[in-house]
Swiss-Prot record:
GO terms for cellular component: plasma membrane. Keywords: Cell membrane, Membrane, Transport. Interacts with TRPM8 (via N-terminus and C-terminus domains); the interaction inhibits TRPM8 channel activity. Interacts with TRPV6. Its main location: membrane. Residues 541-840 form the Peptidase M60 domain. It holds the Pfam family Peptidase_M60. This is TRPM8 channel-associated factor 2. It comes from Bos taurus (Bovine).
Amino acid sequence: MATTPAAAFEALMDGVTSWELPEGPVPSELLLTGEAAFPVMVNDKGQVLIAASFYGRGRLVVVSHEGYLLDAGLARFLLNAVRWLSPSPGAPVGVHPSLASLAHILEGSGVEAQVHPEPAEPLGVYCISAYNDTMTAELIQFVKRGGGLLIGGQAWHWASQHGSDQVLSEFPGNQVTSVAGVYFTDTYGVKGRFKVSKKVPKIPLQVRCGEDLRQDQQQLLEGISELDIGTKGLPSQLLVHGALAFPLGLDASLRCFLAAARYGRGRVVLAAHEGMLSAPSLGPFLLNAVRWLAKGQTGKVGVNTSLEKLHTLLLEHGLECSLEPHLTSGVCVYCCTAYSDKEAKQLQEFVAEGGGLLIGGHAWWWASQNPGRSALADFPGNVILNSFGLSILPWTLDPGCFPVPSADSLNYHFRKALSEFQATLNLEGGNLEKNWLAKLRVDGAAFLQIPAEGVPAYASLHRLLRKQLRLRLSGFPAVSRENPVAGDSCEAVVLCLATELARSGTDCSELAQGLGAWSCSSNLCPSEHTVEINARNPSDDAWMSTGLNLPNGQLTEVCLCEAAACAGLKLQIGCHTDNLMSASKLSRAPVVTHQCHMDRTEQLVSNLWGGLLYVIVPTGCNLGPMSITIKRAVPAPYYKLGETSLEAWRSCIQESPAPWGELATDNIILTVPTADLRALEDPEPLLRLWDEMMEAIARLAAQPFPFRRPERIVADVQISAGWMHSGYPIMCHLESVSELIDETGMRSRGLWGPVHELGHNQQREQWEFPPHTTEATCNLWSVYVHETVLGIPRAQAHPALSPPERENRIKTHLEKGAPLCDWKVWTALETYLQLQEAFGWEPFTQLFAEYQTLSDIPNDNPGKMNLWVRKFSEKVQKNLAPFFEAWGWPVEKEVASSLACLPEWEENPMRMYI
């Protein structure tokens, strides 16, 4: 049986070489939503006039005028439709009396059909017009149980009699077909030329109809002037992408935190954090939401047991509701969180058949715990929500109190913005505000992460964008440091959409032809290489360099053994992992790296922007040494201390066309432009110095040396935050490259910044007191490395550590009364430096080691600070409580009393200031 849209379309169009439509009937345009519906016939204006869909175990074919079901010129298609709809070959076909002549057309094609007033047993297929309003429930259940429904009609005449503003929800045919994502609209279908498509036609971006969703927005926001989400957790941003979905709560940048949608016969309201569903400040909105979801029904509201506070709020306002562990029958509205997809299908059917769903949750925490996985595809809430045209994004939104959006703000919609963007690219006008462009950049990139394979609603949009971007090739943004583009420009949107299209599986070789400077030339001669890596990793996920570069847009084939394919390895293309989606100006595309799971022995993968190739070995992997064959890549400059010969290095840097190269030891790997490496005749002295510094870093941190996982520093044309930032990898600007690879300069001038970031990577939450020490204790490593390895005293290592500067900071802090809120950065560092100057580095090293073995460490700053006071005092056998109190630390009486038995610290440097 044809169970996919592509196979279904092929079955429906078998032998249909032309559309012989009768001239008389005026059809209605069909609106398709959800993930199951797909077009079958589309006119030259892009209007869908015949569609098909799946629901439950059954199927539907929807025709935009009943006259099409009664015309012998469509006999071949009608025969195909009945055969495809049939749950089994030869299943009985019933025809409603209003379509009696259809039975004759089918019989003329060899299909026995009988006139039946209703879809009773043992019928497998039932044919009916869209005007019957007495069998809605029976028809839905007939399809849900596995039957096939052929239904035809137009809604424009009904709308003229009953009002266009009710057509989607009240037109009889929509009461049935909407459960499967197909709606008759009041818009006339143009009777133009009809091309027979070879594959599933595209679904239009927008379909206009008389029913205005702004009425729903007004009902949900009635009596509300502001939406206060400031106290109930950190929300995610929401993506509103369905044709019948709409925003309700927006911040000043159009980032959405409340949204709603119609779906089938039901409705959905989504909050970007479950805490919003119990916030007293949102009480009026929540009551509006439940009433809107109920659509005037008097049934019970079911509240999941995870939302007890919401249950209490609803009871207080007189609503009949009950706590339920899961969705139960008999409720008209169900309220739950978005953290489980066990009931995804049941919830979708509940809404499709008329239920109301109030749901809330965020995806940012899930994304942080599932690196490498797409929240749009895999987050449980999105498994439920995507088909409703709503999704929860892995990005946060600053909470606060926001005014109810203006009508203009609520007018923003992803599909509308994309339609205007398309018109702009086609030089057909287009009217996109700057804030719409900035929002479209984020929304478009997010939408393209929803898996599109086998889902016409998403695949159609992918096809549309591919076509637009291919037409745009000659003007593809040549973004670079010399030619940056604004974050709220059409060029930025193109960069984002092209990147995500390529990441979603689109062949990007054609797109890559229009790239500018941020790439390795595709005119190289890539070849096959076998590389050896050590796939034993006791530490966190580690990038293993291959020494290879993939040209932009090039498709590479990766081959590995069965054992490796089962080891959880990933392939990463590119090392510039900073996401620049929030940047106001772009010197490169926002996302230029790509990861994929290496779960097959042979795999094809590409990246629009090319990049160095890495194998990511997961923590705990014990695979050991292994070989990987990589085709169509080029060698990149790579020097490993103790392994690469000088001859091989010099040959590589002169010949390699790759734009980036790496210098590596067992403890640190530097990724810098090849152009900078060409001046480095012999990397060995430089890397030996780096290893000395890394050994010092490990020594102070009481960590093993060599490092369990080498640290990485990557230079980039643009990074996401600051001059440099810590992490894996540490990121820096190109201006910092010279200090990273200049041994002479490092020894004479030092390199405070890079070691500062390496220090950040050594900080541990057990003895960190954010935000006070975040930018302070990391500098202990900068001081230590400069003094013990580079021979540069602290007073010369950084201007802020000159004696006058230090003394002035102490006096200023004490003159203010030593407020803890001001104890940060250099002021906080001074406390630690005074301890080090009195007691040396050994107490620090010993404490860092001891903290690795401690349990039951407090989670709050006061608790952690008092533990540090006690531990450091015990380590040096001096009562340091007065010293820390002088700095404004909240030393508890109990701690001070316990330390009173220790000798007084007579040399306390703070005495002279008090």
